[in-house]
From Swiss-Prot:
The lineage of its organism: Eukaryota, Discoba, Heterolobosea, Tetramitia, Eutetramitia. Belongs to the heat shock protein 70 family. One of its GO terms (molecular function) is ATP binding. InterPro entries: ATPase_NBD (IPR043129), Heat_shock_70_CS (IPR018181), Hsp_70_fam (IPR013126). Induction: By stress conditions e.g. heat shock. Keywords: ATP-binding, Chaperone, Nucleotide-binding, Phosphoprotein, Stress response. On the 2D-gel the determined pI of this protein is: 5.7, its MW is: 46 kDa. This is Chaperone protein dnaK.
């Protein structure tokens, strides 16, 4: 899993993205 900061949404926060 990749943990990053999502600044592209109005609800900015920490996003957890699945990487294949």
């Amino acid at each position: 899993k990749i943990i990053g900061i999502d600044l592209g949404t109005t609800n900015s926060x920490v996003a957890v993205m699945e990487s294949n």
